[in-house]
Every structure is written in C-alpha cells, then in structure tokens.
C-alpha cells in the first residue's frame, strides 16, 4: 500500500490536511524545518511547490513565493534533494510535488520519475498538463510507483472526469474556485454538490483546494471532502513572519487540523 493510501486509511474516516509550501521560500533550511514542523502540528500529507518562472495558475501570494525561491537558485533537482533529506528522518508522511510541466520536461520524464521515486516522492501534480498530452509522464510515474494526481475544476467535462477517474492515483484535487490560487470567495454549498457529483465517477479520495484560508472554511469543506488543501494562507504566513516561519505555520496548521478532526 502506498504512503498516500496509508495516510488516508490511518484517518479512519477523518479528513486529511494537506498544506502547501514552495520549496526554497525563504530558503532550503527553512523549508525542511517547515516540513517537519507541519507534520508535528498535524499535517497528513505535504504538498511541495516546484518553483517556476511563469506560474499561470497561481495567485500573487504563491507567485511571490516562487520568485523568492527562484532568486535563491532553486531548481527541480533541489526540490528532489529536499525530499531526500526529509526522508532521512521521516519515512511515513506522503510528499506530493505540485508544479508545471516545463521543468520536468527539461529533466526528461523517465529520469524525473526515477529520481522522484528514489528521493521518496509519492505523487506528482502538474497544473498545466492536459490529459491528452500527459500520457508519457503518466507511464513513467506509474512504472516507478509514483501517483499521478489530477486537478478537476468546476468546468471540467464529464468525459474528462471519467478519464481522470481511470488514470488518477493517490487522490484527486478539486479546484473549488475558477481562477487562480488565493481567490477570496468560497461557496461551500456548491462545493458540496460538486463533490457528490464527482463521487459517481471517482473512487479515490477527493481533496479540495483554492479558497480555504481559516478554520471555519476548513471545517465546512471537511464535511464533504476527504482532504483539505491549503496553499496561499500557509505561504502568506511564511511571507509575513520572517525569522519565525516555522512557529507561525505550525500554529496555523494545528488550527486547521483541529477544525477537521
């Protein structure tokens, strides 16, 4: 059983908290401290952002984080190295990479999948990869027992949902809002209806991200989703608490986890 499946099974009906941070923001040492701190505070799965120069799906908060990481010279290989170091002391917590296809394409799909598996990566989500073009990467990830995680948006068609249901591993990431990450309004009733619809086709856990920023919104979404994915709010805590990032993020993660237990 994969680490992601084990993580969901261990919750015994509870809801997973999946926080997102950008690797290298503000630096590698802090990233590692944040990863361990978030796990200690209740995170069930970690989502690591791979910095990219044109993060079209991200709002301004995560864009700034990517810019800071890139200014530090962070590359995809550095991200894999961070996971490798994390695995020296944590062999249980699942780690998912989230980013754009370009850095993976440059490395080569086979090499990336092999190196990701060796480093201890459990899943990969590329936000700009249409299903029609992801077949090569999907095969390499599957051959190396790394889950290929897909986004589903409010506008995703039924045919595409059916295809995703056949290919997806680990969990499916439902984008609860149209637009970029960090958008403000979240219609929990609409999300609930959409999750119920998706469950007709998808038999792995469905996580919800985009727009979850506090305990109240996490609690509401946790009533219908298997996982709560929080990115912009976590990254904003890092941005606003220079020198005290781990403590600030740890407190927020604990608050969010307590809301969905």
Curated annotation (Swiss-Prot):
It catalyses: (1S,2R)-1-C-(indol-3-yl)glycerol 3-phosphate + L-serine = D-glyceraldehyde 3-phosphate + L-tryptophan + H2O. It comes from the Bacteria. One of its GO terms (cellular component) is cytosol. InterPro entries: Aldolase_TIM (IPR013785), RibuloseP-bd_barrel (IPR011060), Trp_synthase_alpha_AS (IPR018204), Trp_synthase_suA (IPR002028). Pathway: Amino-acid biosynthesis; L-tryptophan biosynthesis; L-tryptophan from chorismate: step 5/5. GO terms for molecular function: tryptophan synthase activity. Its EC number is 4.2.1.20. Pfam families: Trp_syntA. Keywords: Amino-acid biosynthesis, Aromatic amino acid biosynthesis, Lyase, Tryptophan biosynthesis. The active site is at residues 47, 58. It is an enzyme of class 4 (lyase). The keyword Transmembrane helix does not apply. Belongs to the TrpA family. Tetramer of two alpha and two beta chains. The alpha subunit is responsible for the aldol cleavage of indoleglycerol phosphate to indole and glyceraldehyde 3-phosphate. This is Tryptophan synthase alpha chain. It comes from Neisseria gonorrhoeae (strain ATCC 700825 / FA 1090).
């Amino acid at each position: 059983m994969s680490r992601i499946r084990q993580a969901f099974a261990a919750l015994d009906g509870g809801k997973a908290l999946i926080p997102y941070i950008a690797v290298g923001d503000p630096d590698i040492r802090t990233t590692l401290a944040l990863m361990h701190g978030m796990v200690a505070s209740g995170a069930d799965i970690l989502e690591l952002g791979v910095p990219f120069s044109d993060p079209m799906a991200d709002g301004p908060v995560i864009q700034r984080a990517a810019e800071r990481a890139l200014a530090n010279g962070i590359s995809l290989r550095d991200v894999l190295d961070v996971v490798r170091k994390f695995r020296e002391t944590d062999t249980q917590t699942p780690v998912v990479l989230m980013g754009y296809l370009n850095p993976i394409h440059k490395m080569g799909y086979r090499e990336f999948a092999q190196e990701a598996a060796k480093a201890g990566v459990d899943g990969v989500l590329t936000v700009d990869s249409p299903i029609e073009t992801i077949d090569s990467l999907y095969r390499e990830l599957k051959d190396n027992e790394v889950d290929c995680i897909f986004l589903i948006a409010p506008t995703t068609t039924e045919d595409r949902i059916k295809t995703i249901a056949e290919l997806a591993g680990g969990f499916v990431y439902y984008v609860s809002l149209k637009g970029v990450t960090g958008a403000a309004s979240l219609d929990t009733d609409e999300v609930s209806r959409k999750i119920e619809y998706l469950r007709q086709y998808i038999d792995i856990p469905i996580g919800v991200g985009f727009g979850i920023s506090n305990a109240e919104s996490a609690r509401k979404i946790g009533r219908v989703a298997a996982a709560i994915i929080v990115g912009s709010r976590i990254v904003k805590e890092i941005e606003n608490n220079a020198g005290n990032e781990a403590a600030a993020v740890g407190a927020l993660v604990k608050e969010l986890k307590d809301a969905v237990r």
